[in-house]
């Protein structure tokens, strides 16, 4: 099993979710996060409400900007399909398109049923 963590533009969340659901991957966690890459932050790119003072009062000229972090667990054989789908929706060729991390998962346990492994996805 693989954990896929995608940091994307908030404005791409709905489309990404729709595509993943259409491929049979409706289970995911989405978090609002602040971050930046190597480039200077694109301060005008706001996909959800954030206090401008929070952005403008940061020291230095490298500001954190809002992003959405999606996390989902998929069987090993589906990881490439999910990564490609996320890339297709989110790749514009511009700074700020995001990052995708693919990590191994040792086990999953559903608390309610005690199911383990892929049955718990």
From Swiss-Prot:
One of its GO terms (biological process) is nitrogen fixation. It comes from Methanococcus maripaludis (strain DSM 14266 / JCM 13030 / NBRC 101832 / S2 / LL). GO terms for cellular component: cytosol. Keywords: Nitrogen fixation, Transcription, Transcription regulation. InterPro entries: N-reg_PII, N-reg_PII-like_a/b, N-reg_PII/ATP_PRibTrfase_C, N-reg_PII_CS. SUPFAM superfamilies: GlnB-like. Could be involved in the regulation of nitrogen fixation. GO terms for molecular function: ATP binding; enzyme regulator activity. The gene is glnBII. Belongs to the P(II) protein family. This is Nitrogen fixation nifHD region glnB-like protein 2.
């Amino acid at each position: 099993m693989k954990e896929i963590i995608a940091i994307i533009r908030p404005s791409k969340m709905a489309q990404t979710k729709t595509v993943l659901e259409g491929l049979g991957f409706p289970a995911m966690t989405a978090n609002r996060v602040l971050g930046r890459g190597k480039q200077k932050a694109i301060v005008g790119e706001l996909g959800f409400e954030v206090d401008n003072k929070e952005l403008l009062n940061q020291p230095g000229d490298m500001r954190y900007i809002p992003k959405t972090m999606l996390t989902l667990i998929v069987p090993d054989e589906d990881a490439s399909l999910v990564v490609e789908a996320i890339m297709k929706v989110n790749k514009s060729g511009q700074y700020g398109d995001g990052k995708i991390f693919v990590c191994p998962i040792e086990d999953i346990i559903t608390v309610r049923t005690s199911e383990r492994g892929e049955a718990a996805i």
